[in-house]
């Protein structure tokens, strides 16, 4: 990935102080989506990264992982599978809990997400990797469906939080921008 693209992406992402709570500097990728040529460059760069890896599906984490993941799946000509918050998928699901700062939450995937095929090759994608809780839970769901996660991909990885290190212990991890 070239440095010019990285700089353009950084410039296009809005930072919002004290959101969703005091002390957090939120990285808002919705502003990137206002620049179609830049968004196309991002998806083209990710397509180039994954094209030769024989990926069968892109798995996107709710909600901004849907934006990146569906565009990348389209570019690669592969299927897209959503990982959603508990209770949002209509058919039979598998569920995985994960810890939050205060309490826990759960995410789900349809039990037939990969058309019932075992051993499919997937890339997990989301906009941002912070603590790694949601991504690690997503990996468990992928594993439970007997799929192989080739790589976990994030537009942004927050270096000061443990997510990058925790995920790298389980799967190859790629963060386009490390902040």
From Swiss-Prot:
GO molecular-function term, one example from the UniProt record: AMP binding
Subcellular location(s) per record: Cytoplasm
User: What are the transmembrane regions?
Assistant: none
Q: Which domain of life is it from?
A: Bacteria
Name a GO CC annotation attached to this entry.
cytoplasm
**Gene Ontology terms describing biological process:** adenine salvage; AMP salvage; purine ribonucleoside salvage
The protein depicted here goes by the name: Adenine phosphoribosyltransferase
Give the organism, scientific name.
Helicobacter pylori (strain Shi470)
The taxonomic lineage of its organism, from the top, reads: Bacteria, Pseudomonadati, Campylobacterota, Epsilonproteobacteria, Campylobacterales
Gene that this polypeptide is encoded by: apt
